[in-house]
Amino acid sequence: NDFIKKNYADYKSDFFSAFVIHASQMTKQSGYCGFFTPYVWMFIQSYEKMRNYLYNQATIETLIQFEYSAFEEATVPVCTFAFQNRHVQKKGCYLRLVDFRGGMEVQRQKTLEAIKNHDCGFYYEQNTDNFSIIPGSPVAYWASTKMLESFQTGNKFAGETKKGVLTGDNNTYLRLWHEVNIGKIGFELYSHAEMIDSSMKWFPVTSGGEKRRWYGNFDTIVNLENDGADIKANVKNYRLRDSQYYMLEAITWTEISSSIFTCRYVPKGILFGNGGPVSFFFNKKLMYHLALLNSKVAMEILGYLAPTINYGPEQINRIPIVYSNEDEVNQLTKWNILLSQTDWDSFETSWDFQHHPLLRKVPTIAEAFDQWQAECDDRFNQLKANEEELNRIFIDIYGLQDELIPEVEDKDVTVRKADLGRDIRSFISYAVGCMFGRYSLDVDGLAYAGGEWDASKYASFAADKDNIIPICDDEYFEDDIVGLFVEF
């Protein structure tokens, strides 16, 4: 390590990167070097100086990027490449085999196919001088001329992108919102000053979460009582900064995700956490940026900027923005947020949950489910149509008609369809909540979650008097869970 740091300080990210440079220095000018290495050097910031060395001091002649797990003997994704040890103006040949699963035999077959047929769809020719057009200079050999133009002429990303509250001890200071006394949660607070004045203990915070577009994944709270006094007194590696941004409107996403990149709208009143970075716009084109980030165009761009599973502020800030059709884009974005929020709030895990969607004025649960299913299908289909229209708009704006298609697969639409098993189980859960008084048929949202009991809220269905509900394998009690559910 000491030798590497002393002699190859700019290439110390890994032994292999220092060795590549060392091999180049040992090779005569115009000679050739070939390597089989992890492919992280092609994209990650810590290898940028290695990339620039190869661009300026050498010429990449060939490179094959293998499928993520193709080479079983390696524990990391790999590539193989060869370069001439001097810089000349010429295009290199690149094979992109990342989509072909099945091990090295499949990779071998695809390599031979590309050699015979350059129109196969995964063979590319690119001049390394073009790589510097993209911020960070990644080896984005498959970037088209139109895409490179967007980096040259596009506008700077308008948001201020940040990572937020880092407690240093999530097990102690983070909770799901329904795990604590709701009277101690600071909802509807819109600034750092209001947080302090509220005397509340818990506050909503972004936390990343599963693949979801437009709205949702809001279920986490953080203990910042007395401006985080407990964290400051007991934790060393915490980060509580940028308090001027607390509780502001923003866009958030999950920083580390093996799935597709998805963004969500954050309304005022929610803190920004470390696992859910945010971008603040201060009313400057937030809706437009949200639409772009959730489009296929952004996914294509992030393929160059963040081809690993990490979507940090640095990668997002490098996305080039081209403005057009703003009114139409903004209207579709607001519609999508509403559709996604309606879906999110239909389940108990949302703190804005009002009542169960199967609670309807129809004779049977079967009829209620049929209505709910129709609503879910309509919402799903509308959101899919809206997303495809936004894809069309951005594909046209960026001139990528020959590269991308607007269609969205059903698996990538992130509102939920009706599911009989799941929804009946959640209905039983809601019924149990009514039995214990947490919910009421006469009141939207939470009827009781601590504090003073108000019996007037339970006119239609009374909560269990002793708050004990037997669960038996047969009908032994009139007030067991089966009897109460039938009554419900």
What are these regions (language model features)?
Residues 1-192, 217, 227, 233-234, ...:
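Signature of N6-adenine DNA methyltransferases within the class I
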